[in-house]
A protein has these predicted regions:
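Short, hydrophobic beta-strand segments
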Residues: 140-142, 246-255, 653-659, 772-791
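Extended acidic/polar, glycine-enriched regions
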Residues: 145-147, 207-292, 655, 661-662, ...
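Short flexible loop/turn segments that cap and initiate beta-strands
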Residues: 216-221, 259-265, 624, 630-637, ...
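Beta-strand-rich binding/interaction modules
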Residues: 119-121, 201-237, 246, 266, ...
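Extended carbohydrate-recognition surfaces in non-catalytic/accessory domains of CAZymes
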Residues: 22-109, 162, 168-171, 183, ...
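Accessory beta-strand-rich segments of carbohydrate-active enzymes
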Residues: 32-35, 83-187, 212-214, 348, ...
Length: 816
């Protein structure tokens, strides 16, 4: 009897296995061997950026150029234009991978490889790509042996003067392999889009394409599941046609938006008889998008102005190597500011970034190219455009079109061809490709030569005409635009260094200083740009502007304007947050305008000005209130009200004649009804006497700590997956607990237990200290230490030491 039962169970198990055999399987490939010269090899974890460890040196990609986009006519030495890190040159990755038995096809998927990847399998070239920012797929079935070990090799080549910013080097985004049986859904040919939706009902169209041994009659079940896994709609399609199309009707749908990023799961199951041939699942959101002259930009039928930022792909001290926790930190910090959209400037986004934007609620303008035929740098993408651009734009759209967060495609940024008929024809061609593979979203691009683009018809052909800067020309632009609206596709380019203030305070488009820093009074910008105040005036006074994307949400490696020719500047000053991810004063300026759920009252500058006693030291307040009263050591400096007629006083509260005296400044802010909404205070700090930690574990907390001021004990949990990160902001305090804003002590870091020291960053654009060495100076009193979990569970102990003052502090994190 026992023997018979075992036989029956074995048979049942075999039948179950048969019914599930050969359905797709996705395997991540994180462990590779890496070499720069093909001789010395080291094991690395992918994503990997071979250049981020440095050292910084002006010799790396030293460019003698005139940047036409900046209005330059004479060539000058640009020492930090692409980050001053060793990303140029060749690199090689290899791994041995055993292809499991029972499958018929294998496809390698690269989410991005910098750059010009050539992929070989078992010594034979299997495929190649040109653009380092694009995802691509290579069918390696003809080159592998199932059930045996196979050698996969990737050769990369980064050439000098091929980038205007830091691109990184290597397999900087994930690599995976997809395994299939006899028949499967073509992964990027599955397209889910909302046809119409309101609170009562939605219609969702699903398109799919079968590949492999098609032609046989079969059954495809398409189901829509809610977040709890409950089936809310289903359709069954039968027959031999490999092209599948159906519509799902959903009652009382949850609509996706930044405020409520609800995600459904689409599950496609292909049957051959009773056997499951393939299962494809993907997350999507139900939502509608529209743009029009009368209603502007609409999400789910509601008009809203885009409150966006531009983001480069690097993650500061982590370089280009993608990391989930770091991306979450970026997105959450922007959302807490009130930002609701990201422009992926100026290249294709990653899968991970888009998935996080879907789940966290961040709209996206997914960009493609920084140049077309005419180059902006000698060896840039223009070399590949004619051969590769159709493939690249097709990959972008087909790869990412199921992400509800993406609300428009961008086909270019400040393209030199915008003056010509040829440029207009290219623009229309690229836009048509976007429409071919995704008729549900509008297409835009950022134009910086408005007169040329309007004269050639370049601007008129776009679904959404996007203009970079020159906000004062919006009036003339709109007169020639049949669309009846425009987008501030790139705005502001205000420059500042966190915690640095310059006197006298001036409004300037060309201010520079011997120390290579910019003033955080937020009155300095570039020759082609403007202040945030100028953009907001246009948006508030005229409905024709459907929103903006500020340059930039974060500082990034490379492009150290206005210090392009000043060494050792090697990263940007444009960010609302600095390179370490710490908010500058400007963060609170945007928060006061964009975050409608919380009040903002932020006072600047700091109040440590030894040697300026009795000198005029202006005080600003960023607030959503309309009025404020400032006190210096308890004495009122008067109540100030925002003034719509003044460029700098419409969106700021300013006390321009305050004379410095040590002690305390305090501001109290009020709304239009005279009710108090907030206050902020700054104290003159004494000598540093103690250390403070503020901890961020982005994958485990709802809000970025640097905004809300987390304590040492807050959110100390990490995933024991070898990838999770904790960001610990370190600052020095005096004996009374006041932050020391001028402290520049060198700190050392030691990590023990179930984790490792990953990197450190202080936000100083002129610092040449390597990110990956366990010591760094404070900048404006702060720096950020990044700790990475291992795959071992247990305590992770970070110890930070200031030898100069004999101050030491530790914190224990937990990897679970």
């Amino acid at each position: 009897m026992i023997k018979r039962s075992i036989t029956f169970m074995t048979l049942a198990l075999a039948l179950t296995t048969l019914c599930q055999a050969q359905s797709r399987k996705i395997i991540n490939l994180p462990s590779w061997d890496f070499s720069r010269d093909g001789k010395a090899w080291q094991q690395v974890a992918v994503p990997h950026d071979w250049a981020i460890s440095g050292p910084f040196d002006k010799k790396w990609d030293l460019q003698m150029v005139a940047i036409e986009q900046n209005g330059e006519t004479e060539k000058t030495e640009k020492s930090g234009r692409s980050g001053a890190l060793p990303w140029i040159g060749e690199g090689m990755y290899k791994m041995n991978w055993t292809a499991p038995k029972g499958y018929k096809r294998a496809v390698l998927v690269f989410d991005g490889a910098m750059s010009q990847p050539v992929v070989s399998v078992n010594g034979k070239e299997a495929g190649r790509w040109a653009y380092g920012y694009n995802a691509f797929r290579i069918d390696i079935t003809p080159f592998i042996q199932f059930g045996k070990s196979n050698l996969i090799e990737v050769h990369l080549n980064n050439v000098e003067e091929s980038s205007r910013w830091y691109p990184g080097g290597g397999l900087y985004r994930p690599v995976s392999v997809e395994l299939y049986g006899n028949e499967n859904f073509s992964t990027w040919d599955t397209f889910v889009r909302t046809l119409k939706a309101d609170k009562q009902e939605a219609e969702v169209e699903v398109n799919a394409l079968l590949e492999g041994k098609t032609g046989k009659s079969g059954k495809t079940v398409i189901a829509l599941l809610d977040e709890a896994g409950k089936k809310v709609a289903e359709q069954i399609v039968t027959g031999a046609n490999p092209e599948i199309k159906t519509t799902l009707k959903v009652a009382n749908p949850q609509l996706w938006s930044p405020e409520s990023p609800y995600l459904y799961q689409v599950k496609l199951t292909r049957y051959e008889g009773k056997k499951v041939a393939d299962v494809q699942t993907l997350k999507t959101g139900i939502r509608t998008i529209a743009v029009s002259k009368n209603n502007g930009f609409q999400l789910n039928g509601i008009t809203r102005k885009l409150k966006g930022v531009c983001l480069h792909h690097d993650l500061g001290p982590l370089g280009a190597a993608e990391n989930k926790a770091a991306l979450i930190r970026q997105i959450k910090m922007m959302k807490q500011m009130g930002c609701d959209a990201i422009r992926t400037a100026h290249n294709m986004p990653s899968t991970m970034q888009m998935e996080l934007c879907d789940s966290l609620g961040m709209m996206v303008m997914a960009e493609s190219f920084d140049m077309w035929i005419y180059p902006k740098c000698k060896n840039g993408y223009a070399k590949f455009f004619k051969e590769w651009s159709d493939k690249d734009i097709t990959n972008l759209v087909k790869h990412h079109r199921n992400h509800p967060s993406i609300v428009m495609w961008s086909i270019g940024n400040e393209i030199p061809e915008q003056w010509s008929k040829e440029g207009m024809e290219i623009a229309k061609h690229l836009q048509d490709i976007c429409h071919q593979y995704d008729p549900s979203r509008p297409v835009t691009q950022g134009m910086d030569k408005a007169e040329d683009a309007l004269k050639s018809g370049f601007a008129q052909v776009m679904d959404v005409p996007g203009f970079n800067y020159r906000v004062h020309k919006y009036f003339k632009n709109i007169e020639q635009l049949p669309q009846g609206f425009l987008l501030g596709s790139e705005t502001a380019s205000t420059v500042s260094s966190r915690g640095v203030y310059k006197f006298p305070v001036v409004v300037s488009d060309k201010a520079t200083y011997p120390d290579g820093q910019c003033s955080s009074y937020d009155t300095e910008y570039c020759s082609w740009s403007n202040l945030p105040d100028d953009d907001w005036k246009m948006q508030d006074d005229y409905s024709l502007v459907i929103g903006e994307f500020v340059w930039t949400g974060y500082d990034y490696l490379g492009e150290p304007t206005p210090y392009d020719t000043y060494w050792p500047s090697r990263s940007s000053y444009f960010g609302i947050c600095d390179l370490a991810g710490l908010p500058k004063d400007r963060y609170y300026m945007y928060r006061a305008r964009w975050n409608e759920q919380q009040h903002t009252t932020h006072l600047l500058p700091h109040w440590n000005w030894k040697g300026r006693e009795g000198e005029v030291t202006p005080v600003y307040c960023y607030t959503d209130g309309v009025e404020g009263e400032l006190f210096v050591n308890g004495k009122s400096q008067g109540r100030v009200r925002k003034d719509k007629s003044s460029r700098l006083d419409r969106y700021r509260l300013r006390w321009n004649n305050v004379k410095y005296e040590p002690g305390e400044i305090r501001v109290v802010t009020y709304n239009q009804y005279g009710d108090k909404i907030g206050e902020d205070v700054k104290h003159t700090a004494g000598e540093p006497a103690q250390m403070k930690f503020s901890v961020e574990t982005p994958d485990h907390e709802p809000i970025a700590c640097m905004v809300e001021g987390c304590t040492d004990e807050h959110n100390v949990i990490l995933n024991a997956d070898g990838n999770d990160l904790a960001f610990i902001t370190v600052s020095l305090l005096d004996k009374d607990g006041n932050e020391c804003p001028l402290a520049d002590d060198e700190l050392t870091f030691e990590v023990s237990g179930a984790g490792t020291f990953k990197a450190a960053c202080n936000g100083d654009a002129t610092s040449l200290e390597p990110f990956t060495q366990p010591q760094m100076k404070l900048f404006s009193g702060k720096l950020v230490v990044i700790v990475q979990s291992s795959k071992q569970k247990g305590d992770i102990i970070l110890k930070v030491k200031d030898s100069k003052r004999n101050i030491e502090k530790s914190i224990t994190l937990q990897a679970i």
